[in-house]
Amino acid sequence: MSNKNVNVRKSQEITFCLLAGILIFMAMMVAGRAEAGVALGATRVIYPAGQKQVQLAVTNNDENSTYLIQSWVENADGVKDGRFIVTPPLFAMKGKKENTLRILDATNNQLPQDRESLFWMNVKAIPSMDKSKLTENTLQLAIISRIKLYYRPAKLALPPDQAAEKLRFRRSANSLTLINPTPYYLT
């Protein structure tokens, strides 16, 4: 191998290391900014049958921003159907504050009682606008956090902690299929 080839290879390695370092630095900067804003207190909500309500915490981690929070529940197809009511459905949240959403069952026992039912809990955070910037061109994004809401009937045949043991796997050609014979959604 000639000196020229070695120098080119070292130059490529140095360039690669510099680019990787810049990419890592930029990722760390973005991750630091991701801490600010609105966060939900759970990654999913389980609504046990018979309860009057369940709660979901919403936190504004941004010290300097106020958000308008809008929340609602959709069915598994993504359509609002009024089977669950969220209160308050709309409120303003100042910086470094927490509020609790209450989810109320309005199904009148019309959901299947032999298995869980899937819904989507949606929380939209709309940032406030600084009045001094109203004359400027600005881009503001409203973020919707969407988590699963499971309605769990009271008398399911299998306890939830035994559901994972009942899962089965089937292998065929180049795929692996998971078979869930339980009444639970397992995620």
Task: State what each model feature region is.
Residues D81-N109:
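Intrinsically disordered, low-complexity Pro/Gly/Ser/Thr-rich segments with frequent PxxP/GP/PP motifs
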Residues L68-Q70, E74-P89, T187:
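Short beta-strand and strand-turn-strand segments in soluble, beta-rich domains
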Residues V54-N60, I103, F119-K124, L176-N180:
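Buried hydrophobic-core signal for structured, non-transmembrane domains
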Residues E35-V58, L158-R171:
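Beta-sheet-dominated interaction scaffolds and their linkers
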Residues M29-A31:
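N-terminal signal peptide c-region/cleavage motif recognized by signal peptidases
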Residues M1-E13:
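N-terminal secretory signal peptides that target proteins for export/translocation
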Residues N108-A154:
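Terminal connector regions
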Residues D62-S65, P127, P181-Y184:
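Short, acidic/polar linear motifs in exposed loop/turn regions
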